[in-house]
Protein backbone atom coordinates (compact mmCIF):
# COMPACT_ATOMS: atom_id res chain seq x y z
CA UNK A 1 0.00 0.00 0.00
CA UNK A 2 1.30 3.46 -0.85
CA UNK A 3 0.20 4.76 2.57
CA UNK A 4 2.03 3.11 5.46
CA UNK A 5 2.29 3.11 9.23
CA UNK A 6 5.05 5.26 10.72
CA UNK A 7 6.01 7.11 7.52
CA UNK A 8 9.45 8.71 7.55
CA UNK A 9 8.35 12.27 6.82
CA UNK A 10 10.49 15.11 8.13
CA UNK A 11 8.03 17.77 9.37
CA UNK A 12 10.45 20.48 8.24
CA UNK A 13 10.26 19.17 4.66
CA UNK A 14 6.58 20.15 4.54
CA UNK A 15 7.37 23.80 5.21
CA UNK A 16 4.62 26.10 6.41
CA UNK A 17 1.29 24.30 6.06
CA UNK A 18 -2.11 25.95 5.90
CA UNK A 19 -5.19 23.99 6.94
CA UNK A 20 -8.20 25.39 5.12
CA UNK A 21 -11.38 24.80 7.11
CA UNK A 22 -14.77 26.32 7.77
CA UNK A 23 -15.72 28.01 4.53
CA UNK A 24 -19.12 29.10 3.28
CA UNK A 25 -20.88 25.85 2.39
CA UNK A 26 -23.75 24.16 4.21
CA UNK A 27 -21.12 21.78 5.62
CA UNK A 28 -19.19 24.53 7.43
CA UNK A 29 -19.74 23.02 10.88
CA UNK A 30 -18.33 19.66 9.82
CA UNK A 31 -15.40 21.32 8.05
CA UNK A 32 -14.44 23.16 11.23
CA UNK A 33 -14.41 19.84 13.07
CA UNK A 34 -12.36 18.13 10.35
CA UNK A 35 -9.87 20.97 10.09
CA UNK A 36 -9.37 21.19 13.83
CA UNK A 37 -8.48 17.50 13.93
CA UNK A 38 -6.08 17.82 11.00
CA UNK A 39 -4.44 20.91 12.48
CA UNK A 40 -3.90 19.20 15.83
CA UNK A 41 -2.46 16.12 14.11
CA UNK A 42 0.06 18.15 12.11
CA UNK A 43 1.11 20.24 15.07
CA UNK A 44 1.55 17.10 17.19
CA UNK A 45 4.10 15.91 14.62
CA UNK A 46 6.04 19.16 14.74
CA UNK A 47 4.69 20.64 11.51
CA UNK A 48 4.49 24.43 11.24
CA UNK A 49 0.73 24.31 10.62
CA UNK A 50 -1.82 27.13 10.77
CA UNK A 51 -5.60 27.22 10.38
CA UNK A 52 -7.18 29.42 7.71
CA UNK A 53 -10.94 30.03 7.31
CA UNK A 54 -11.83 31.37 3.83
CA UNK A 55 -15.18 32.58 5.18
CA UNK A 56 -13.54 35.08 7.52
CA UNK A 57 -10.15 35.63 5.87
CA UNK A 58 -9.57 37.09 2.41
CA UNK A 59 -7.85 35.84 -0.72
CA UNK A 60 -5.24 38.55 -0.17
CA UNK A 61 -4.54 37.14 3.28
CA UNK A 62 -4.22 33.64 1.82
CA UNK A 63 -1.77 34.89 -0.80
CA UNK A 64 0.25 36.72 1.85
CA UNK A 65 0.29 33.84 4.35
CA UNK A 66 3.35 32.24 2.78
CA UNK A 67 2.05 28.68 2.88
CA UNK A 68 4.29 26.12 1.19
CA UNK A 69 1.33 23.76 0.86
CA UNK A 70 -2.21 23.50 2.16
CA UNK A 71 -4.45 20.75 3.48
CA UNK A 72 -7.97 21.31 2.14
CA UNK A 73 -10.35 20.32 4.94
CA UNK A 74 -13.22 22.25 3.35
CA UNK A 75 -16.37 20.30 2.48
CA UNK A 76 -18.96 21.13 -0.16
CA UNK A 77 -19.11 24.26 -2.26
CA UNK A 78 -16.26 26.76 -2.44
CA UNK A 79 -13.83 24.14 -1.20
CA UNK A 80 -14.53 20.69 -2.64
CA UNK A 81 -15.90 21.78 -6.02
CA UNK A 82 -12.79 22.98 -7.85
CA UNK A 83 -13.08 26.66 -6.92
CA UNK A 84 -10.51 26.63 -4.13
CA UNK A 85 -8.34 24.29 -6.15
CA UNK A 86 -8.38 26.79 -9.02
CA UNK A 87 -7.43 29.64 -6.71
CA UNK A 88 -4.51 27.66 -5.29
CA UNK A 89 -3.38 26.83 -8.83
CA UNK A 90 -3.29 30.56 -9.57
CA UNK A 91 -1.34 31.20 -6.37
CA UNK A 92 1.04 28.32 -7.11
CA UNK A 93 0.43 26.70 -3.71
CA UNK A 94 0.34 22.87 -3.75
CA UNK A 95 -2.78 21.42 -2.15
CA UNK A 96 -4.12 18.08 -1.00
CA UNK A 97 -6.59 15.95 -2.88
CA UNK A 98 -7.95 16.10 -6.40
CA UNK A 99 -7.32 18.84 -8.93
CA UNK A 100 -9.70 21.39 -10.42
CA UNK A 101 -11.52 19.22 -12.96
CA UNK A 102 -11.80 16.07 -10.84
CA UNK A 103 -13.05 18.09 -7.87
CA UNK A 104 -15.68 19.84 -10.00
CA UNK A 105 -16.83 16.59 -11.60
CA UNK A 106 -17.08 14.70 -8.32
CA UNK A 107 -19.02 17.54 -6.68
CA UNK A 108 -21.68 17.37 -9.41
CA UNK A 109 -23.60 14.13 -8.93
CA UNK A 110 -25.16 14.39 -12.40
CA UNK A 111 -21.80 14.77 -14.16
CA UNK A 112 -20.27 12.03 -12.02
CA UNK A 113 -23.02 9.54 -12.80
CA UNK A 114 -22.99 10.29 -16.53
CA UNK A 115 -19.24 9.72 -16.67
CA UNK A 116 -19.47 6.48 -14.71
CA UNK A 117 -22.26 5.25 -16.96
CA UNK A 118 -20.12 6.01 -20.03
CA UNK A 119 -17.51 3.65 -18.57
CA UNK A 120 -20.11 0.98 -17.70
CA UNK A 121 -19.68 1.43 -13.96
CA UNK A 122 -22.85 0.55 -12.06
CA UNK A 123 -24.71 3.48 -10.50
CA UNK A 124 -28.45 3.90 -9.83
CA UNK A 125 -30.64 5.16 -12.69
CA UNK A 126 -31.55 8.81 -12.30
CA UNK A 127 -33.42 11.82 -13.67
CA UNK A 128 -32.92 15.55 -13.31
CA UNK A 129 -35.81 17.42 -11.69
CA UNK A 130 -36.99 20.96 -12.40
CA UNK A 131 -40.03 22.97 -11.31
CA UNK A 132 -41.89 22.00 -14.50
CA UNK A 133 -40.90 18.32 -14.45
CA UNK A 134 -43.69 15.76 -14.68
CA UNK A 135 -42.96 14.06 -11.37
CA UNK A 136 -45.48 11.28 -12.01
CA UNK A 137 -43.62 10.40 -15.22
CA UNK A 138 -40.32 10.25 -13.31
CA UNK A 139 -41.87 7.91 -10.75
CA UNK A 140 -43.35 5.75 -13.51
CA UNK A 141 -39.94 5.49 -15.17
CA UNK A 142 -37.67 5.01 -12.15
CA UNK A 143 -40.09 3.40 -9.72
CA UNK A 144 -40.28 3.84 -5.95
CA UNK A 145 -38.66 4.44 -3.56
CA UNK A 146 -36.57 7.31 -4.94
CA UNK A 147 -33.81 9.40 -3.43
CA UNK A 148 -34.18 13.12 -4.21
CA UNK A 149 -31.22 15.37 -3.45
CA UNK A 150 -29.33 18.48 -4.54
CA UNK A 151 -26.82 17.70 -7.28
CA UNK A 152 -24.04 19.59 -5.51
CA UNK A 153 -24.33 19.13 -1.75
CA UNK A 154 -22.86 16.57 0.61
CA UNK A 155 -23.39 15.04 4.07
CA UNK A 156 -26.97 14.08 3.03
CA UNK A 157 -27.99 17.76 3.25
CA UNK A 158 -31.29 18.37 1.44
CA UNK A 159 -31.84 14.66 0.81
CA UNK A 160 -35.26 12.97 0.95
CA UNK A 161 -36.41 9.40 0.51
CA UNK A 162 -39.64 9.37 -1.50
CA UNK A 163 -41.94 6.40 -0.99
CA UNK A 164 -45.07 7.85 -2.61
CA UNK A 165 -45.49 10.03 -5.70
CA UNK A 166 -47.35 12.62 -3.62
CA UNK A 167 -44.08 13.37 -1.77
CA UNK A 168 -42.15 14.35 -4.90
CA UNK A 169 -43.00 18.06 -4.94
CA UNK A 170 -42.00 18.59 -1.30
CA UNK A 171 -38.77 16.61 -1.77
CA UNK A 172 -37.94 18.61 -4.87
CA UNK A 173 -38.53 21.95 -3.14
CA UNK A 174 -36.36 20.91 -0.18
CA UNK A 175 -33.46 20.09 -2.50
CA UNK A 176 -34.07 23.03 -4.85
CA UNK A 177 -33.71 25.44 -1.93
CA UNK A 178 -30.03 24.44 -1.90
CA UNK A 179 -29.23 23.91 -5.57
CA UNK A 180 -30.67 24.79 -8.97
CA UNK A 181 -29.99 21.21 -10.07
CA UNK A 182 -31.90 18.44 -8.32
CA UNK A 183 -31.45 14.75 -8.96
CA UNK A 184 -33.80 11.80 -8.37
CA UNK A 185 -32.26 8.35 -8.37
CA UNK A 186 -33.53 4.84 -7.86
CA UNK A 187 -33.24 3.71 -4.24
CA UNK A 188 -31.02 0.67 -3.83
CA UNK A 189 -32.21 -1.57 -1.01
CA UNK A 190 -29.22 -3.19 0.63
CA UNK A 191 -26.08 -2.60 2.66
CA UNK A 192 -24.59 0.89 2.82
CA UNK A 193 -20.82 0.85 2.31
CA UNK A 194 -18.00 3.32 1.94
CA UNK A 195 -14.53 2.76 0.55
CA UNK A 196 -11.67 5.24 1.12
CA UNK A 197 -9.07 5.55 -1.63
CA UNK A 198 -5.52 6.87 -1.86
CA UNK A 199 -2.97 7.44 -4.61
CA UNK A 200 -3.41 8.43 -8.24
CA UNK A 201 -3.90 6.62 -11.54
CA UNK A 202 -2.01 3.33 -11.64
CA UNK A 203 -1.03 3.73 -7.97
CA UNK A 204 -4.62 4.24 -6.76
CA UNK A 205 -5.54 1.82 -3.97
CA UNK A 206 -8.53 1.10 -1.76
CA UNK A 207 -8.46 1.02 2.02
CA UNK A 208 -10.70 -1.45 3.89
CA UNK A 209 -14.43 -1.16 3.20
CA UNK A 210 -16.69 0.08 6.01
CA UNK A 211 -20.29 -1.09 6.39
CA UNK A 212 -22.66 1.49 7.86
CA UNK A 213 -25.65 0.41 9.95
CA UNK A 214 -27.74 3.48 10.82
CA UNK A 215 -30.86 3.66 13.02
CA UNK A 216 -33.88 2.74 10.88
CA UNK A 217 -31.46 2.64 7.90
CA UNK A 218 -31.43 6.44 7.98
CA UNK A 219 -27.83 7.63 7.58
CA UNK A 220 -28.70 11.33 7.54
CA UNK A 221 -26.74 14.42 8.62
CA UNK A 222 -27.60 13.91 12.29
CA UNK A 223 -26.72 10.23 12.32
CA UNK A 224 -23.50 10.87 10.40
CA UNK A 225 -21.99 13.36 12.81
CA UNK A 226 -23.92 13.87 16.02
CA UNK A 227 -25.13 10.54 17.41
CA UNK A 228 -23.48 7.37 18.63
CA UNK A 229 -26.33 5.16 17.44
CA UNK A 230 -24.88 4.47 13.99
CA UNK A 231 -22.70 1.35 13.79
CA UNK A 232 -19.58 1.28 11.62
CA UNK A 233 -18.29 -2.19 10.82
CA UNK A 234 -14.64 -2.41 9.80
CA UNK A 235 -13.88 -5.18 8.99
CA UNK A 236 -17.10 -4.93 7.02
CA UNK A 237 -18.21 -8.52 7.50
CA UNK A 238 -18.43 -8.98 3.73
CA UNK A 239 -16.86 -12.01 2.12
CA UNK A 240 -13.33 -11.44 0.83
CA UNK A 241 -14.64 -11.78 -2.74
CA UNK A 242 -17.38 -9.16 -2.33
CA UNK A 243 -15.09 -6.75 -0.47
CA UNK A 244 -12.55 -7.05 -3.28
CA UNK A 245 -15.27 -6.40 -5.89
CA UNK A 246 -16.40 -3.25 -4.06
CA UNK A 247 -12.81 -2.03 -3.76
CA UNK A 248 -12.13 -2.65 -7.44
CA UNK A 249 -15.28 -0.76 -8.44
CA UNK A 250 -14.30 2.15 -6.17
CA UNK A 251 -10.79 2.31 -7.66
CA UNK A 252 -12.24 2.33 -11.19
CA UNK A 253 -14.64 5.13 -10.25
CA UNK A 254 -11.77 7.13 -8.71
CA UNK A 255 -9.60 6.74 -11.81
CA UNK A 256 -12.38 7.60 -14.25
CA UNK A 257 -12.94 10.92 -12.47
CA UNK A 258 -9.21 11.63 -12.43
CA UNK A 259 -9.01 11.83 -8.63
CA UNK A 260 -5.73 11.93 -6.76
CA UNK A 261 -4.37 12.07 -3.23
CA UNK A 262 -7.34 10.67 -1.36
CA UNK A 263 -11.11 10.38 -1.58
CA UNK A 264 -14.00 8.19 -0.45
CA UNK A 265 -16.50 6.32 -2.61
CA UNK A 266 -20.00 5.69 -1.25
CA UNK A 267 -21.52 2.43 -2.45
CA UNK A 268 -24.76 0.49 -1.98
CA UNK A 269 -24.62 -3.30 -2.07
CA UNK A 270 -27.94 -4.62 -3.34
CA UNK A 271 -29.43 -7.70 -1.71
CA UNK A 272 -28.37 -9.82 -4.72
CA UNK A 273 -24.73 -8.81 -4.16
CA UNK A 274 -24.41 -6.21 -6.93
CA UNK A 275 -22.62 -2.98 -5.86
CA UNK A 276 -23.79 0.45 -7.06
CA UNK A 277 -21.73 3.64 -6.90
CA UNK A 278 -23.50 6.59 -5.28
CA UNK A 279 -20.92 9.38 -5.19
CA UNK A 280 -17.26 10.27 -4.75
CA UNK A 281 -16.17 12.56 -1.92
CA UNK A 282 -12.88 14.26 -2.81
CA UNK A 283 -12.47 16.03 0.54
CA UNK A 284 -13.78 13.48 3.05
CA UNK A 285 -14.55 14.23 6.66
CA UNK A 286 -11.81 13.90 9.27
CA UNK A 287 -13.95 14.27 12.41
CA UNK A 288 -14.21 11.86 15.33
CA UNK A 289 -17.11 10.15 13.52
CA UNK A 290 -15.45 10.15 10.09
CA UNK A 291 -14.89 7.04 8.05
CA UNK A 292 -11.52 7.53 6.35
CA UNK A 293 -9.58 7.60 9.66
CA UNK A 294 -11.48 4.45 10.70
CA UNK A 295 -10.46 2.57 7.55
CA UNK A 296 -6.90 3.82 7.90
CA UNK A 297 -6.76 2.48 11.47
CA UNK A 298 -8.00 -0.89 10.21
CA UNK A 299 -5.05 -0.84 7.78
CA UNK A 300 -2.68 -0.08 10.66
CA UNK A 301 -2.30 3.64 9.91
CA UNK A 302 -2.94 6.15 12.69
CA UNK A 303 -4.88 9.39 12.16
CA UNK A 304 -1.66 11.40 12.46
CA UNK A 305 0.28 9.18 10.05
CA UNK A 306 -2.54 9.36 7.52
CA UNK A 307 -2.71 13.16 7.71
CA UNK A 308 1.06 13.47 7.31
CA UNK A 309 0.97 11.34 4.14
CA UNK A 310 -1.97 13.24 2.65
CA UNK A 311 -0.24 16.59 3.13
CA UNK A 312 3.11 15.23 1.90
CA UNK A 313 1.36 14.32 -1.38
CA UNK A 314 0.08 17.87 -1.94
CA UNK A 315 0.65 18.97 -5.52
CA UNK A 316 -0.64 21.13 -8.38
CA UNK A 317 -2.36 20.29 -11.67
CA UNK A 318 0.09 22.59 -13.42
CA UNK A 319 3.65 23.31 -12.40
CA UNK A 320 4.54 26.94 -13.17
CA UNK A 321 7.68 27.68 -15.16
CA UNK A 322 9.70 29.76 -12.74
CA UNK A 323 11.67 31.29 -15.62
CA UNK A 324 8.64 32.47 -17.59
CA UNK A 325 8.18 36.23 -17.90
CA UNK A 326 5.51 38.20 -19.76
CA UNK A 327 6.72 39.85 -22.95
From Swiss-Prot:
Disulfide linkage: none
Cofactor-binding details, from the entry: Binds 2 magnesium or manganese ions per subunit.
Record organism: Cupriavidus pinatubonensis (strain JMP 134 / LMG 1197)
Protein name: D-alanine--D-alanine ligase
Alphabetical GO biological process terms: cell wall organization; peptidoglycan biosynthetic process; regulation of cell shape
Keywords, comma-separated and alphabetical: ATP-binding, Cell shape, Cell wall biogenesis/degradation, Cytoplasm, Ligase, Magnesium, Manganese, Metal-binding, Nucleotide-binding, Peptidoglycan synthesis
Predominant location category: cytoplasm
Annotated ranges, domain ATP-grasp: 113-312
Superkingdom of the source species: Bacteria
